[in-house]
């Protein structure tokens, strides 16, 4: 009966911009900054928009190019914001890796590596899933 289970394309039902905004709050609680710590000016236009809503910016101070994922475990990730938010939500809720991987269409071993990275960061006090748990807006 396991194969007969109804699967919803949940990541297609989640708003990318809202997921981006949540990740921005989680990954950069003090605002987006370049890798050298220079703040993103509120009036600065993106350097590159090809992955919107993930926008690349070029720092006006040092010239470094950065985005939402720079300096995080998601650096160089090609996953959509919605997929990452749903992954974090599943981990926060204790969903078994195999079920989460099936639901999100991800490789189980890749998801397991990410889960271990996230759990290590939480243990070191460098990351919290609280904003994911408490973000109940739909």
Where are these regions (language model features)?
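Residue-level recognition of single "structural anchor" positions
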Residues: 1-138
């Amino acid at each position: 009966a396991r194969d007969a289970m109804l699967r919803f394309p949940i990541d297609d039902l989640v708003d990318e911009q809202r997921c981006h905004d949540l990740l921005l709050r989680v990954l950069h609680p003090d605002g987006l900054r370049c890798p050298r710590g220079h703040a993103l000016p509120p009036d600065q236009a993106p350097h590159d928009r090809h992955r919107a809503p993930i926008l690349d910016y070029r720092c006006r101070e040092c010239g470094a190019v950065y985005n939402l994922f720079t300096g995080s475990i998601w650096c160089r990730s090609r996953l959509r914001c919605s997929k990452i938010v749903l992954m974090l939500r599943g981990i926060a809720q204790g969903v078994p890796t195999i079920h989460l991987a099936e639901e999100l269409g991800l490789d189980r071993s890749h998801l397991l590596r990410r889960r271990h990275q996230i759990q290590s960061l939480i243990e070191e006090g460098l990351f919290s899933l609280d904003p994911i748990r408490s973000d109940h807006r739909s």
